[in-house]
């Protein structure tokens, strides 16, 4: 079995209220370091993913973020390639200011478990 070790499903742009974008800026380095340290010796892990369907890549800041994340991963493990799942349709929507993952209507917070 081959494994793509995926770190994030988003960076700065929220898909839902409780997703990783709320803490990305403060935690991405620690989380990548932990993930790579955990899986570095696993022979099934053949590549790393720095994002899945991240619409930020439609903008210069997103391209810079992808480059920064890739360089960081390669500094920790230069033996595996790094990829990101880019959904071009989401990028088009992002360019037009449409957030397909945004919740419709007023936000109603859900209680979080203790």
What is the meaning of each model-derived region?
Residues 1-114:
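Substrate-binding/catalytic cleft of secreted carbohydrate-active enzymes
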